[in-house]
Amino acid sequence: MGDPRRLGKKYDTPNHPWIGERIQKEREISHKYGLVNKKELWKMETQLRNYRRQARKLISDTTTQGGKEAVQLFNVLKRYAILVEQEPTLDHILSLNIESILERRLQTLVYRKGLAKTAKQARQLIVHGHIAVNGRRVTSPSYLVSVSENNAIGYVPNSPMALENHPERTTAVSEENQ
C-alpha cells in the first residue's frame, strides 16, 4: 500500500521522449482539443489503455464473472458515449481511439455546443466558473460528461455570461445561428 498523502500518477509518460512523429501527432491533437499540456493527453491515453487492457483480459476470461465484468465495462463506456454501438463487443473496445474519449470532455462539448468561440475560450469559461452541468458549477475542463448530462450544459445562472447582451455571448450565439 502506498502513502495516502502521496497519490500515484494517473498517467504514463511515453517510453522515448523525442520521437518526432509522436510529438507532431500530440501537438495536432492538443491544438484540436485545446489541451494545455501533454499531461492532459497522457491521462486520457492511459485511461484508454486501461479500458483496452481490461477488454483483452476479458476476451480470454470465459467464466460467468468475466461476462458480468464485460457488461459492466460496456455500461461504463456507453454511459459516457465513448462506445456508441448498439450491440458492443470487446473488439469494439479494442478499436477505440483517443479522440473518442477527448470528444466527451466538458471543454470539447462546450466548444461544440457553441457556448464558446474556440476550444481555448471554452477552457477559460470553465476554469473561471461560467459553465454549469445540471445546475452545478464545474471548473474542470477534463470533466467527462455522461450522456444524461449532455443536454444540461449551460451557463451558470449568476454568471455575467448568462446575460443575453454580453458581448462574448452574442458573438457565440450569432455564429451558431448562421
From Swiss-Prot:
Q: Which InterPro entries does this entry report, sorted A to Z?
A: Ribosomal_uS4, Ribosomal_uS4_arc, Ribosomal_uS4_CS, Ribosomal_uS4_euk/arc, Ribosomal_uS4_N, S4_RNA-bd, S4_RNA-bd_sf
The set of disulfide-linked cysteines is none
Chain coiled-coil ranges:
none
Q: Which GO terms describe its cellular component?
A: small ribosomal subunit
- The answer to whether UniProt assigns keyword Ribosomal protein to this entry is yes
Q: PROSITE patterns attached here?
A: RIBOSOMAL_S4 (PS00632), S4 (PS50889)
Kindly give the SMART domains that the UniProt entry links to this protein: Ribosomal_S4 (SM01390), S4 (SM00363)
Describe the location of the S4 RNA-binding domain by residue ranges.
104-166
Q: Among the record's GO biological process terms, what is one?
A: translation
Q: What keywords would UniProt list here?
A: Ribonucleoprotein, Ribosomal protein, RNA-binding, rRNA-binding
Cited Pfam families: S4
Q: Which CDD domains match?
A: S4
Give the UniProt family note. Answer: Belongs to the universal ribosomal protein uS4 family.
NCBIfam families named among the record's database cross-references: PRK04051.1 (NF003139), uS4_arch (TIGR01018)
What the protein does? Answer: One of the primary rRNA binding proteins, it binds directly to 16S rRNA where it nucleates assembly of the body of the 30S subunit.
Protein name as annotated: Small ribosomal subunit protein uS4
Source organism per UniProt = Methanococcus vannielii (strain ATCC 35089 / DSM 1224 / JCM 13029 / OCM 148 / SB)
Instruction: Give the source lineage, highest ranks first.
Output: Archaea, Methanobacteriati, Methanobacteriota, Methanomada group, Methanococci
Task: From the UniProt record, report the name of the gene that encodes this protein.
Answer: rps4
